[in-house]
Amino acid sequence: MRLSAAVIALLSTSAAAFSVYRENSVSANDELDVPGKSPLRFCDAAADRKDDIVTIEEVILTPNPPEAGQTLTIEASGIVKEAIEEGAYVNLQVKYGYIRLINTSADLCKEMKNVELECPIKKGRLSITKNVELPKEIPPGKYTVEADVYNSDDKHITCLTATVFFGRKTLGFLDDL
């Protein structure tokens, strides 16, 4: 739950989350890619995001790609166009392959407390750096995460999605065989 709290909190404030491509690092290269060094993508085209409360400028993940059992550092920056207050919520969906693991609506401000952030988030420029300890035991496979975030008046804050691939851990000397 700590990892999902980090995802929820970062998505709402200057909006970051994590996702993993095991094969390669990914950088922004089309209008849906979040700028920076992460495989995060916007859910909607730029024209559809113009009225969102949060404008995400950059998200950097270190290491990219993240690895099970490692500390993931998330650096995010953006602009909050209006304060985010109590009552904000996130619709969060996590799938493992085609299996839905999580499909919930969560209190954004309550979840942000788990990563030492609090509502209200004031209007203005915001930069965040957070460390997340990834568990060692992440089952290998493809994960898809979507977080669609709204304020208490149902005004859209942001929506991000990511595809996450975790591979099997191997013994290093066996890789050369």
UniProtKB/Swiss-Prot annotation:
It comes from the Eukaryota. SMART domains: ML. GO terms for biological process: intracellular sterol transport; sterol transport. GO terms for molecular function: phosphatidylcholine binding; phosphatidylinositol binding; phosphatidylserine binding; sterol binding. Residues 1-17 form the signal peptide. The keyword Transport applies. GO terms for cellular component: fungal-type vacuole lumen. InterPro entries: Ig_E-set, ML_dom, ML_PG-PI_TP, NPC2-like. Keywords: Lipid transport, Signal, Transport. Residues 18-30 form a propeptide. Catalyzes the intermembrane transfer of phosphatidylglycerol and phosphatidylinositol. Monomer. Belongs to the NPC2 family. This is Phosphatidylglycerol/phosphatidylinositol transfer protein. It comes from Neurospora crassa (strain ATCC 24698 / 74-OR23-1A / CBS 708.71 / DSM 1257 / FGSC 987). The gene is npc-2.
